[in-house]
Amino acid sequence: MPDPILLTPGPLTTSATTRHAMQHDWGSWDAAFNQLTASVCADLVAIARGGDEYVCVPMQGSGTFSVEAALGTLVPRDGVVLVPDNGAYCARILKILGRLGVEAIALPFGEDAAVDPAAVEAAFAREPRITHVALVHLETSAGILNPLDAIAAMCRQHGRRLIVDAMSSFGALPIALADSGIDALVSASGKCLEGVPGMGFAIVRRDALDACEGNSPSLALDLQDQHAYLRKTGQWRFTPPTHVIAALRAALDQYLAEGGQPARGARYAENCRTLVESMRALGFAPFLDASVQAPVIVTFHAPDHPAYDFRRFYDAVRDAGFILYPGKLTKVETFRVGCIGAIDAGDIRRAVAAIAQALESLGIAMQRVSADA
């Protein structure tokens, strides 16, 4: 029986080539593996258009490990971090800062509203103590895209440091770090690069990283120490996820062969268009306005029907070969469908057909939703 297609924001469906890359064992101190790490890091900086200003620091674990590593390493203990908050992953950053004992100021927005750069600027005026901004580029709770370039410009203008969680955007959406003023951009292997989960990374400005020696309260999550050791020896400080890195190397080779960010972004955008149009035809209304919808994951309102139960709906779709994602909003019942991974518009159409069959099996009839809804 074939594996189900994962319509999630990660882990996601990977290619056979990427999975095959994990069939070989690597010595973590061997020169060939060191070269593998170096080549992956070089490509990640190039994808971020970082130039010589930036270095890539890989880190074991999920993306959240690298987010915490970046915050713990780059923000001094007496720093004050502004966190624009429009979803669960923004809230996670606030929780991390709380555990680190760093003062954080939440700037709340609605779950369906992008971060407003003018509100960020107003917060700088109200709170001159703010030293850093921690921004989630693509808040996957709803799939909302926040205006990174405008906020980066605002931070440059006002002399604030910017750390970006680009977990679900890096590789699919255009990002140019050079001359941006961004201190660090964080992402992970198992998202839009279509690798497998297990490695995060921070692409960090060299001068910002070099100034942080001894700042991290953690040994394992010290980006500066990790980078210094890699630079000196070519090796990771502690056991690396060798198979994950080999899979990411294979995934990056496919990414570059596909055409890099423009081609990956175009495929995901077509997946997203196909998904939204097909789901509207079934009667599902997207939660977000199209102007702020990122082509990575789409949140839909759950059916307003007494027979609807997410678990039964999920199981019916899974039995047809597709894995959906539960909603993560606080005020309305929703579910989410991912557009990313080694999938195309044909897979999306088959998934929507499976959703239609699931509705029929549950006895749920819905009316087509217009594009204006």
Curated annotation (Swiss-Prot):
Its EC number is 2.6.1.37. Signal peptide: none annotated. SUPFAM superfamilies: PLP-dependent transferases. It comes from the Bacteria. GO terms for biological process: organic phosphonate catabolic process. Pfam families: Aminotran_5. The modification N6-(pyridoxal phosphate)lysine is found at residue 191. It catalyses: (2-aminoethyl)phosphonate + pyruvate = phosphonoacetaldehyde + L-alanine. Its cofactor is pyridoxal 5'-phosphate. It is an enzyme of class 2 (transferase). Keywords: Aminotransferase, Pyridoxal phosphate, Pyruvate, Transferase. The keyword Transferase applies. One of its GO terms (molecular function) is 2-aminoethylphosphonate-pyruvate transaminase activity. Involved in phosphonate degradation. Belongs to the class-V pyridoxal-phosphate-dependent aminotransferase family. PhnW subfamily. Homodimer. This is 2-aminoethylphosphonate--pyruvate transaminase. It comes from Burkholderia ambifaria (strain MC40-6). The lineage of its organism: Bacteria, Pseudomonadati, Pseudomonadota, Betaproteobacteria, Burkholderiales.
